[in-house]
C-alpha cells in the first residue's frame, strides 16, 4: 500500500516536471518511515542528467528529501541494455518503494523487472511509450507504470532543415540498433522526408565505440546530420560534432 500511495503522489506531477497537486509526503507517510527510490539512468549526458536532477528536486518540493524521509539510489547503465536490466533487477530485489527510469531502455527494463511486483515505475525521456510497450495504443498506462514522453517534432525539424539548406537532398541519422525510441523516430523521418524533398540515410551502432567509424562513413553520403534522442549517440556527440565540422557537414 505504501508503494501505491507514493506512486500516486509522484506521477500526478510528472508532466509538468515537478511533483505537485496531490498532497505532500507528510500526507501519505502515515508510518513515518523512510521511502526508498531507485533511479535507473541509461546513459551519462546532459539531458538525462537534467531529468535526474529535476526528479530529485521535485521530490524535495513534495516533502521527500534525502537524509530526512527519503533514501535514493542512483545507478547508471552506461548506455548498455544488459546493465540496465541488471540495475532494474537489483532495485526489485532490494524492494524499492518506486523506480524512476530515465530513457527508453531503462524504462523497459524497469517495467519488465517490476511487472509482477507492487513496485511502481515512473519513467521520463521516453520517446514513444506505446512503441516501447509502456502504454496502450490509446495512451493509457500499462500496469503500475506511467511517465512522460520526449517525442521529437519531426515535421518541424524537416521544415527547418529545408529552410536553412534549400539545396540539401540527403539527411543522415546515426542511431543505436537496440533503442526502440530511435527506431520509432527513424520511421517518422522516413514517413515525412519525401514531403520535404529529402531521402534518409542511416547508420546503426551497438555501442559508443562504433560511433566514430559509423559517423565517418555516413558523413561521406549526406548533406547534413540530424540528431535523435538516442542515448548512445548523444553520449558520443562531441566526437560526431568534431567529425562533422571537419567534413563541413551541418548537424541539426
Residues of each region from the PLM?
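Extracytoplasmic "Venus flytrap"
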Residues: 36-62, 73-82, 178-182, 232-235
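Structural motif
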Residues: 71-93, 203-219
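Beta-alpha junction/loop-to-helix N-cap segments that form part of ligand/metal-binding clefts
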Residues: 77-136, 230-245, 249-252
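Pocket-lining segment of extracytoplasmic ligand-binding domains
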Residues: 174, 180-249
Amino acid at each position: 500500500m505504501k508503494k501505491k500511495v507514493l506512486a500516486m503522489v509522484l506521477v500526478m506531477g510528472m508532466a509538468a516536471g515537478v511533483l505537485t497537486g496531490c498532497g505532500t509526503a507528510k500526507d501519505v507517510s502515515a508510518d513515518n518511515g523512510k521511502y526508498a527510490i531507485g533511479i535507473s539512468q541509461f546513459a551519462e549526458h546532459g539531458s538525462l542528467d537534467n531529468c535526474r536532477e529535476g526528479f530529485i528536486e521535485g521530490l524535495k518540493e513534495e516533502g521527500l528529501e534525502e537524509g530526512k524521509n527519503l533514501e535514493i539510489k542512483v545507478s547508471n547503465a552506461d548506455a548498455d541494455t544488459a546493465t540496465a536490466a541488471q540495475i532494474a533487477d537489483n532495485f526489485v530485489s532490494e524492494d524499492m518503494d518506486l523506480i524512476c527510469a530515465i530513457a527508453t531502455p531503462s524504462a523497459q527494463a524497469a517495467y519488465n523487472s517490476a511487472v509482477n511486483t507492487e513496485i511502481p515505475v515512473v519513467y521520463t525521456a521516453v520517446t514513444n511509450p506505446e512503441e516501447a510497450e509502456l502504454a496502450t495504443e490509446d495512451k493509457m498506462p500499462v500496469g503500475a507504470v506511467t511517465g512522460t514522453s520526449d517525442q521529437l517534432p519531426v515535421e518541424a525539424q524537416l521544415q527547418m532543415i529545408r529552410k536553412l539548406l534549400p539545396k540539401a537532398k540527403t539527411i543522415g541519422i546515426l542511431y543505436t540498433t537496440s533503442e526502440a525510441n530511435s527506431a520509432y523516430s527513424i520511421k517518422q523521418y522516413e514517413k515525412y522526408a519525401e514531403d520535404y524533398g529529402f531521402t534518409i540515410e542511416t547508420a546503426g551502432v551497438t555501442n559508443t565505440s562504433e560511433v566514430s567509424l559509423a559517423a565517418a562513413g555516413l558523413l561521406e553520403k549526406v548533406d547534413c546530420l540530424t540528431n535523435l534522442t538516442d542515448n548512445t549517440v548523444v553520449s558520443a556527440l562531441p566526437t560526431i560534432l568534431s567529425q562533422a565540422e571537419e567534413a563541413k557537414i551541418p548537424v541539426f
